[in-house]
């Protein structure tokens, strides 16, 4: 269910977000409480999730010294009260058709690719790596953007060059690794491993590359507790991997290979996911989520 905002025209729906036109130069970027996994949007919302994602993005946009799409503070008067705390006023950009993924550790689809081919997105890796093996230096492992209900596809660097040209592809790779490295160092200082993350970039009217969408949220990143990190096993996480693990476990009764929609989440899984998202935000930012603006779920 999307917010009905009478003052603004709805222009697009994503898996988790809704986009509204503010004027010719600005959009309203609204994070809902929907959650997606394995490229499906689940039936069960996670209470306050949209506010947590927005709070985390605002924190990291402030921490990072790179151009981004924000066009005002999270309490900008142009943001309607009913979406306060889960919406951002952003600049219109020409978005690039690439998911820019940085991997500092081997897990998820990267691990599956490695187990099948010995490589990840064209990066040939040493033998003997396993779940949660550290990758030094971090890898740029891009993917194509998928529509709702379709699957993102990992691609190699040559495919990115084919999509956006060599100059822009090199820029995307370099910026992705630079931004990830900065954020990973910050998270580790707070006792959390930033295992991987994904970005989206756009281009402004002057041709400048701009960081857009969400950044370093528990939706777009994998966060692990550094104190309990152990290579070779699935890590306890502060992100939606918790939901993925339940869906692929015996309790859900769901067969991922069937390509049928996943079942609803039990209340206890939704509540635990909310708690993990909040813990990630509070530990990394040093702020209390109870102080974040907007109505709580």
From Swiss-Prot:
InterPro entries linked to this entry: SAICAR_synt/ADE2_N, SAICAR_synth, SAICAR_synthetase_CS
GO molecular function: ATP binding; phosphoribosylaminoimidazolesuccinocarboxamide synthase activity
Pfam families, sorted: SAICAR_synt (PF01259)
Keywords: ATP-binding, Ligase, Nucleotide-binding, Purine biosynthesis
Catalytic activity: 5-amino-1-(5-phospho-D-ribosyl)imidazole-4-carboxylate + L-aspartate + ATP = (2S)-2-[5-amino-1-(5-phospho-beta-D-ribosyl)imidazole-4-carboxamido]succinate + ADP + phosphate + 2 H(+)
Enzyme class: ligase
Record's protein name: Phosphoribosylaminoimidazole-succinocarboxamide synthase
GO cellular component: cytoplasm
Entry EC no(s): 6.3.2.6
Family that this chain belongs to: Belongs to the SAICAR synthetase family.
Organism expressing this protein natively: Mycobacteroides abscessus (strain ATCC 19977 / DSM 44196 / CCUG 20993 / CIP 104536 / JCM 13569 / NCTC 13031 / TMC 1543 / L948) (Mycobacterium abscessus)
Pathway annotation from the record: Purine metabolism; IMP biosynthesis via de novo pathway; 5-amino-1-(5-phospho-D-ribosyl)imidazole-4-carboxamide from 5-amino-1-(5-phospho-D-ribosyl)imidazole-4-carboxylate: step 1/2
GO BP annotations listed: 'de novo' IMP biosynthetic process
Superkingdom per UniProt: Bacteria
Keyword presence, Ligase: yes
SUPFAM superfamilies on file: SAICAR synthase-like
């Amino acid at each position: 269910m999307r917010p009905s905002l009478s003052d603004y025209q709805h222009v697009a729906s994503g898996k988790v977000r809704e986009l509204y036109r503010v004027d010719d130069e600005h959009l309203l970027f609204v994070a809902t409480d929907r959650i997606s996994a394995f490229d499906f949007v689940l039936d069960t919302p996670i209470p306050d999730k949209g506010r947590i994602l927005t709070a985390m993005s605002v924190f990291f946009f402030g921490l990072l010294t790179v151009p981004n799409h924000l066009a005002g503070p999270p309490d900008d008067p142009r943001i309607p009260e009913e979406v306060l705390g889960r919406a951002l006023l952003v600049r219109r950009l020409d978005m690039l058709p690439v998911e820019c993924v940085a991997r500092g550790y081997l897990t998820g689809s990267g691990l599956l690719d490695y187990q099948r081919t010995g490589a990840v997105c064209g990066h040939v890796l040493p033998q003997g790596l396993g779940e949660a093996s550290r990758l030094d230096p971090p890898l740029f492992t891009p993917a194509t953007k998928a529509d709702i209900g379709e699957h993102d596809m990992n691609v190699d660097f040559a495919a990115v060059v084919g999509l956006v040209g060599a100059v822009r592809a090199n820029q995307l790779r370099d910026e992705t690794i630079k931004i990830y490295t900065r954020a990973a160092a910050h998270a580790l200082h707070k006792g959390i491993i930033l295992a991987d993350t994904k970005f989206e970039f756009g281009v402004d009217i002057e041709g400048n590359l701009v960081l857009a969408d969400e950044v370093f949220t528990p939706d777009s990143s994998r966060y692990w507790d550094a104190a309990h990190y152990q290579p070779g096993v699935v890590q306890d996480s502060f992100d939606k991997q918790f939901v993925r693990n339940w869906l692929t476990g015996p309790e859900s009764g769901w067969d991922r290979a069937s390509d049928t929609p996943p079942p609803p989440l039990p209340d206890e899984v939704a509540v635990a996911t909310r708690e993990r998202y909040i813990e990630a935000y509070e530990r990394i930012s040093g702020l209390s989520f109870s102080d974040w603006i907007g109505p709580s779920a």
